[in-house]
From Swiss-Prot:
Originating organism: Leptothrix cholodnii (strain ATCC 51168 / LMG 8142 / SP-6) (Leptothrix discophora (strain SP-6))
GO molecular function: structural constituent of ribosome
NCBIfam families, A to Z: L28
Keywords recorded for this protein, A-Z: Ribonucleoprotein, Ribosomal protein
Recorded family membership: Belongs to the bacterial ribosomal protein bL28 family.
Lineage, broadest ranks: Bacteria, Pseudomonadati, Pseudomonadota, Betaproteobacteria, Burkholderiales
Name recorded for this polypeptide: Large ribosomal subunit protein bL28
Amino acid sequence: MARVCQVTGKGPMVGNNVSHANNKTKRRFLPNLHYRRFWLETENRWVRLRISNAALRLIDKVGIEQVVADLRARGEL
């Protein structure tokens, strides 16, 4: 699926643009996605993920090995 974080599952949200005159038109709030490469020491290879900024912080916190293990358990990698 496009514009979805591979780690957290964050996707686009729907909301409104609100003008000064309080007119409302529909808009999409897109997640802050980036393609990033991570080196897996255990497999001696790079893995390329499309992740949000929140997922990048999660990887900094728990480590890429744990995140990849969770992705494999869900069957997404």
